[in-house]
Amino acid sequence: MRYDDYAGGQMAAEQCMEALDGKEDAQVIVFEEEPSIASSGRRVDGFTDWMKENYPNAEVIKNRSTDRTTDGCYAWATDMITAYPDADAFFLYWNECTMGTYHALQDAGKTDVYVIGYDATDEQKQVMIDGGEDCKLYASPGMSPAKMGVKCVEFMEQIFDGSYTRSGADDIYEMTPELLTIQNAKTFDINAMDDGTTEETEDAEKDTAEEIDTTEDGQE
């Protein structure tokens, strides 16, 4: 089981072009995939494939730094916006690079350049809330540990009762990424379940039910 990183990259590309109002000749800088990290390749491929299919005249520039820390990405983004002063947007496939790039562009006075990130972290969410509708950290797909945990339990139950048998190594269940945007930042909860509850709420309800059962047993 894993999140569909390719779909996440496509979501990021779609959000990027939404931010740019469908600019046909947009110039977008992408932090190039790291060969040793499979998910980075899927995210970048999803982004670039979607761009090629939907905006063939857009220029997508792939480049990367050997320093993947927040500070390293800050320096990288500063160099990239200097080399490509007309860039319209950046796509970064993990949180540290997202934040490093965002702050680099802000500090460089490039406050009209959009940033599409990844991981949908609380840090990114707060930047969006503080920036409001004009925030240039526009969107960020991400993964919900709680939802993945729930799905894992469901599959374990199916395995134990014999209703599910894996067909092979390629039989991988992929979950659709969550999407944090400037439009939903104030209400976004990456761990919210489809029924509106969160894992914490469900745990609390379970604990309460167990306490009631214990009380009833004691009364008997």
Model feature map: region roles:
Residues 1-26, 73-74, 98, 121-125, ...:
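Hydrophobic alpha-helical segments within soluble ligand-binding/sensing domains
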Residues 8-15, 38-58, 72, 76, ...:
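Short, solvent-exposed amphipathic alpha-helices that sit
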Residues 2, 27-32, 61-62, 88-92, ...:
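Structural recognition of the beta-strand scaffold that forms the well-ordered cores
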Residues 16, 20, 32, 51-55, ...:
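Sec/Tat-exported extracytoplasmic proteins
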Residues 2-9, 37-40, 44, 66, ...:
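Solvent-exposed, acidic/flexible segments
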Residues 46-47, 62-127:
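Hydrophobic alpha-helical
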Residues 88-89, 103-146, 150-176, 182:
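Exported/periplasmic ABC-transporter solute-binding proteins
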Residues 31, 35, 39, 50, ...:
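Hinge/cleft segment of the Venus flytrap/periplasmic-binding protein
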